[in-house]
């Protein structure tokens, strides 16, 4: 049984996105090795991580660039849980309305993208003064 837990704390700066992506994908490759279809899964995970991390920078920490972003990864066998912790005011998910295609709006697709690409998406407001976005998925074995 494979089990790993790791975390990374980075500044609220989009220039750190590639560092966070490399940390995530490298950690998963070290733990899961050749059993996963990396070209397909890395694109999926990169997109979800970019969406979640950039939302923290642009929204939660918009006026507070000195606050850190904490990213946690739990891996058990091929099940992954990725948590992104922020210090923002939070977002009431009850008020979220997915964008309608005919509306042609430019933003608001992040939650939709993340929930389509991951098996489970959960958001918790104000745990010890922080918010946590949890993204979970089972990575399929390489065919």
Stretches with model-predicted labels:
Residues 28-50, 103-105:
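Conserved short strand/loop->alpha-helix "switch" segment adjacent to the catalytic nucleotide/phosphoryl-transfer site
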Residues 21, 51, 83:
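Acidic-residue sensor for enzyme active/binding pockets
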Residues 52, 56:
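Hydrophobic residues in the alpha-helical elements that line and stabilize the ATP-binding pocket
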Residues 1-8, 12, 57-143:
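Conserved beta-strand-loop-beta-strand hairpin that lines the nucleotide-binding pocket
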